[in-house]
Amino acid sequence: MSSKKPVVLVIRDGWGRNPLGPDVAKEYGDATVLADTPFTDYLLANYPHSLLGASGEDVGLPDGQMGNSEVGHLNLGAGRVVFQDLCRVDNAIKDGSMGENAVLKTAFSQAASSRLHLLGLVSDGGVHSHINHLIGIVKYAYEAGVRDICIHAITDGRDCSPTSGVGFIRQLEEAVRPYGAKIATVVGRFYAMDRDKRWDRNKLAWDAIVLGRGEQCSCSPAEYVEQCYAKGETDEFLKPGIFAYGNEQRVRDNDVVFFFNFRADRARQMSDAFLYPEFDGFDREVTPKVHYVTLTEYDAKYPSPIVFEQEQLNNIFGQIVSEAGKTQLRIAETEKYAHVTFFFNGGVETQFPGEDRILVPSPREVATYDLKPQMSAAEVADKFVDAVNKYDVVIMNFANGDMVGHTGFVEAGIAACEAVDSALEKCVKKVLELGGKLLITADHGNAEHMRNEDGSPNTAHTTNLVDLIYVADDKDQVTLSDGILADVAPTLLSLMGLKQPAEMSGHSLVTPGK
């Protein structure tokens, strides 16, 4: 069988372009500049490159809101600006339609005679949730007659500063006081929002939320968080603190549990424990029969009502490629596998005809990826090189820049970028050998800003632009324009000679001629 001449999209996750430049790279922890990346340097010196907007209104988020992996891959695959759940919920709270939502009305009606548990990430990170959504939900619940409202607050420290949690907890305490709601639990997202089946972490969160196990606190939730900081703990890793109904079954039969995160991937494992009687990830000890509600669709198979149903996207990139009879491959390690499949395919689990997938396991032997910043980049590259000649188009992701960027350890970030650079070289050389073409970009920034001005770690995403690099033998005959992530799918289609559908509002950024 003859080899294909593949078109390849390489997503260097979390690899943005810091506008402050190399002169302040050390001060701001720009791992992408501080790293020794000879191949990336070679590409930028010898191939057309431009910049893409990957945050705010460019990707369907509020102005100034940092981008994230879910949003980035949705826009990359859809070829249009996809308005995000963050904005949809914001608008529903502002215009009052949230209070008229039928799913919420039913949930609040049941909770009026039992207990309402609100579970989710408490920050303004806007990646998985937003504190304003929680405050709005509490208000609407109170107005619907719910009087026993327990908040199980998951602290962030990843999509915002590692010690910003105390401020959010204080803000929440003040905001919900008029409605009699109480913060019953505080626990870090490391435990409550694992997505890699490290069930021992979820067990700690479950025991706290359901059984009231953890540090029994007589102080306020904000004071507890401050005490954790004094012991060297940061928001992501806070052990459970219990502030109401301690050491008893707090989630009971007929209670309502509402997970208010709008992003699905890190909400599924705890949801599985609540929803499935046969769940065996860890010993739950008790399995309360609750009315479980999710803000958005976490899994199409879940037997639970959804407050905001998913908007369906038609004629996305994978669909167009499939309908043209072309073959496609999606490849990433575990941490970003959902992004090149579920999110790139419009937020649905559909695997198109002609679409194959390769999942490379992420390292399980380390708790955080600063301890192994290379992650599985080399293995992803090896699998890619072995498979690429069989496909018309490949979508691949290197997770390192984002996953290690979230740790805030600059030296680890440097090693992560170097690992990606080395793996990228192997992939690019193989594609060029086959006569193929590549677009190299990112879904959002992160690794280019790992240190704050005061020297503290910056673990959050950024609002920076991301590179777009065109790599092909005809590099001297094309011009590459600036754009946004939604322009990538139309560009890929043009490189494949496929017609762009009307639903795609993006534009091809590759034009013939210099």
Curated annotation (Swiss-Prot):
Top-rank taxon: Bacteria
Residues annotated for Mn(2+) 2 binding in this entry: 13, 69, 443-444
Binding residue positions for Mn(2+) 1: 402, 406, 461
Cofactor binding mode and count: Binds 2 manganese ions per subunit.
Keywords for this protein: Glycolysis, Isomerase, Manganese, Metal-binding
Record's catalysed reaction(s): (2R)-2-phosphoglycerate = (2R)-3-phosphoglycerate
Cofactor: Mn(2+)
GO molecular function list: manganese ion binding; phosphoglycerate mutase activity
Pathway of action: Carbohydrate degradation; glycolysis; pyruvate from D-glyceraldehyde 3-phosphate: step 3/5
Single GO cellular component term: cytosol
EC id: 5.4.2.12
Annotated residues for binding of substrate: 128, 158-159, 189, 195, 263-266, 336
CDD domains: iPGM
Job of this protein: Catalyzes the interconversion of 2-phosphoglycerate and 3-phosphoglycerate.
Protein name per Swiss-Prot or TrEMBL: 2,3-bisphosphoglycerate-independent phosphoglycerate mutase
Provenance organism: Akkermansia muciniphila (strain ATCC BAA-835 / DSM 22959 / JCM 33894 / BCRC 81048 / CCUG 64013 / CIP 107961 / Muc)
